[in-house]
Amino acid sequence: MTLFSSISSMSTSMSGSKSSISSFGSGTSMGSNSIACGGCGGSGGILGSGLGLGLGLGLDLTGGSRSRGACGGNRGNGNGNGGMGGGNGSCCGGPCCGI
């Protein structure tokens, strides 16, 4: 059984030319060969700086599952820290939970 939830928020930058999308995702895997991954940052940025923020939390309950952190969006920072079991910060736009 795999439980995945994500909360996204969008805000307009001060310059009004770009928007910043930040997302937080949490995944809990309760079976072998399951994948729990975090959220994915969006494109655009704060004050036009092109910063994508992503926060991810992966919790491995079995020891045999894979947990992945989050990654930044387009032109953003890919700082992904996985939970228990290791992490992979390059899941944005990849096969990690379809995000």
From Swiss-Prot:
Q: Name one GO biological process term.
A: sorocarp development
Region span, Disordered: 1-29
Q: Which Pfam families match?
A: Coiled
| Annotated family | Belongs to the hssA/B family.
Q: Which PANTHER family match?
A: HSSA/B-LIKE PROTEIN 1-RELATED-RELATED, HSSA_B-LIKE PROTEIN 1-RELATED
> This chain belongs to which protein, by name?
HssA/B-like protein 42
